[in-house]
């Protein structure tokens, strides 16, 4: 076959179509068949969180388990006096007050995070909320 002279072609400015690598092309064509296994349903990010927020805002029950809270109260009370006894109503009153305080603190913390144009609360938001409340100088 005789050699022929090739003439220069004018460039179109863009990149031409590339050839795929053999391994990449093989990977695309030969996908393993799952055999009809259905994936578990997943909600979009944030949907479950919003559902939980609505659920907990509706409820009035205590969110911290009673026995772990009671152990914590007894452990803290040990530092002041040994062999202190607590009525069950006293522990429940302490738990109600502690949960009310924490809920209020988290509400203020969330406002601090929103003010900083964030949706995620951070420790600095808690510190700011406590400082504004006058609990910590």
From Swiss-Prot:
Residues 25-36 have a biased composition (Basic residues). The modification N6-acetyllysine is found at residues 10, 15, 19, 24. GO terms for molecular function: DNA binding; protein heterodimerization activity; structural constituent of chromatin. The lineage of its organism: Eukaryota, Viridiplantae, Streptophyta, Embryophyta, Tracheophyta. GO terms for biological process: double fertilization forming a zygote and endosperm; pollen sperm cell differentiation. It comes from Arabidopsis thaliana (Mouse-ear cress). GO terms for cellular component: generative cell nucleus; nucleosome; nucleus. The modification N6,N6-dimethyllysine is found at residues 5, 10, 28, 38. The modification N6,N6,N6-trimethyllysine is found at residues 5, 10, 28, 38. The nucleosome is a histone octamer containing two molecules each of H2A, H2B, H3 and H4 assembled in one H3-H4 heterotetramer and two H2A-H2B heterodimers. The octamer wraps approximately 147 bp of DNA. InterPro entries: Histone-fold, Histone_H2A/H2B/H3, Histone_H3/CENP-A. Pollen specific. Signal peptide: none annotated. This is Histone H3-like 2. Transmembrane segments: none annotated. The modification Phosphoserine is found at residue 11. The modification Phosphothreonine is found at residue 12. The modification N6-methyllysine is found at residues 5, 10, 19, 24, 28, 38. It comes from the Eukaryota. Belongs to the histone H3 family. Disruption phenotype: No visible phenotype. The high redundancy of histones H3 might compensate for this mutation.
